[in-house]
């Protein structure tokens, strides 16, 4: 076992750099725990506010004897022109703060360099979020291998790789509505330019930041991916080949949350009493509930949220609807009460205003569908729980994930969203799916057609394969072993 080797011959020390956004930090904390369970000393470097988000989960891990420590560095907000209190990506109130935020984050290079000079034992490896290109300079200065973590699936990473190698494909498109086929792909898949992450050119300082991110990607030693071989074998194999063998699929990392409290508080403490939520679910028939959650950075316009609510109501099916970023949705709260919506659906609709215990909900036998924004964490959690998906992508890698879920894996139904919802421009787009469209999509997912039954069967099988992948002897468990052996050989050859 690698854990025995690391203790006896060479103590490995990994330093983890999560990006300051909820969807990026959650899996990175899981990765920290997975590696610590193998005897690797883990140091997580983050800012005070972000450290506080994971205090409970990490305290339990440390109390159980896992060798994890957190080092806090102050974000130089003022120096970067960022107003105080904007320590997380999901707390930014406007697009104008995006560049100052990234500037502040990458100004951490100097304090982190000082940390590395004093660290003991000397770090053997850096695992960095791809949004933190400054960690490449740290890795180079201290001659330490840097492993990248994107938080995306192999399907999406391979798509980005192919398009960067064949830039003329995007350059030759006549408009943002024109579709193109991704070449050299195991399946025929079409996209428009805005649907592909990092594909559109943005002028000025943001372009420079993106170029730094791409360059740091190219020069990293390898990549770890939160997926499992059995989920997307052709894409995992092709992406590994594209990375010269240095790509390790180690997921689903969420499965390290075996304790109920860890599942309930993964990412944030829930804004609903866990027992109240489970009691409500217990009262519903098996497979009857649709769980609706559009992520931590969803800011659909009020007009669209109303149509979603009315469609859920007209579907006549029980549902849980999570509205995060609640303070930004005061108008929706008013509509819930003023229109009578909350009163009308109270017997079969549970509204969670804030953070939900998502893993506990998805694992419950009464849940039979998941309406998701297709962020990779949520997508993978749904599949891992054996729940078919109703896809409603917004931006980033989410359209890639939808294509994988609906067209390749055939475990989901599209709500019909084709247009990218650019952050800060939601009102311009307006309603993309009306209440009839919502009702129809819910019926297609939750109904009793042959296709619906086949989707349920397929996703349950993929869920079982996920559980096997992380067990000893499984593909992801073995890949962690392989990664640690690789880094250990490097560490020994450097000393």
From Swiss-Prot:
One of its GO terms (biological process) is saponin metabolic process. Pfam families: UDPGT (PF00201). InterPro entries: UDP_glucos_trans (IPR002213), UDP_glycos_trans_CS (IPR035595). It is an enzyme of class 2 (transferase). GO terms for molecular function: UDP-glucosyltransferase activity. Keywords: Glycosyltransferase, Transferase. This is UDP-glycosyltransferase 1. It comes from Barbarea vulgaris.
């Amino acid at each position: 076992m690698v854990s025995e080797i690391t203790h006896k011959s060479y103590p490995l020390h990994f330093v983890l750099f999560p990006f300051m956004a909820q969807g990026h930090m959650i899996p990175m904390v899981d990765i920290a725990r997975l590696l610590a369970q193998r005897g690797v000393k883990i140091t997580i470097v983050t800012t005070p506010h972000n450290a506080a988000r994971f205090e409970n989960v990490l305290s339990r891990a440390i109390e159980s004897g896992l060798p994890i420590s957190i080092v806090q560095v102050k974000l130089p907000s003022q120096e970067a022109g960022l107003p105080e209190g904007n320590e997380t990506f999901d707390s930014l109130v406007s697009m104008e703060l995006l560049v100052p935020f990234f500037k502040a984050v990458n100004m951490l290079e100097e304090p982190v360099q000082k940390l590395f000079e004093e660290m003991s034992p000397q770090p053997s490896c850096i695992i960095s979020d791809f949004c933190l290109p400054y960690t490449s300079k740290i890795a180079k200065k201290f001659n330490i291998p840097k492993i990248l973590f994107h938080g995306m699936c192999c399907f999406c990473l391979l798509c980005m790789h192919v398009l960067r190698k064949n830039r003329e494909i995007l350059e030759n498109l006549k408009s943002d509505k024109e579709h193109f086929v991704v070449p050299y792909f195991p399946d025929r898949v079409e996209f428009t330019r805005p649907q592909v992450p990092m594909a559109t050119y943005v002028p000025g300082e943001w372009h420079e930041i993106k170029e730094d991110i791409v360059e740091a990607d190219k020069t990293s030693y390898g990549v770890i991916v939160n997926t499992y071989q059995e989920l997307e074998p052709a894409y995992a194999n092709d992406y590994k080949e594209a990375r010269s063998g240095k790509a390790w699929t180690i997921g689903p990392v969420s499965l390290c949350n075996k304790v109920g409290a860890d599942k309930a508080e993964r990412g944030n403490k829930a804004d609903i009493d866990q027992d109240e939520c489970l009691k409500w679910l217990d009262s519903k028939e098996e497979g009857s509930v649709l769980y609706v959650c559009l992520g931590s950075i969803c800011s659909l316009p009020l007009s669209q949220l109303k149509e979603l609510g009315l469609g859920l109501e007209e579907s006549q099916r029980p549902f849980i609807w999570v509205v995060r970023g609640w303070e930004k949705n005061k108008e929706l709260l008013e509509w819930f009460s003023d229109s009578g919506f909350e009163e009308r659906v109270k017997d079969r609709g549970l509204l969670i205003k804030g953070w939900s215990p998502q893993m506990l909900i998805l694992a419950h036998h009464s849940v039979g569908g998941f309406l998701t924004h297709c962020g990779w964490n949520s997508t993978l959690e749904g599949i891992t729980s054996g729940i078919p998906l109703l896809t409603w992508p917004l931006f980033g890698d989410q359209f890639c994930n939808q294509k994988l879920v609906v067209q390749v894996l055939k475990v989901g139904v599209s709500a019909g969203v084709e247009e990218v919802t650019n952050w800060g421009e939601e009102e311009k787009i307006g309603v993309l799916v009306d209440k009839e469209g919502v009702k129809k999509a819910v019926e297609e997912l939750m109904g009793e057609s042959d296709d619906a039954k086949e989707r349920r069967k397929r996703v349950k099988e993929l869920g079982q394969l996920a559980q096997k992948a992380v067990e000893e002897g499984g593909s992801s468990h073995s890949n962690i072993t392989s990664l640690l052996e690789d880094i250990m050989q490097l560490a020994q050859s450097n000393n």
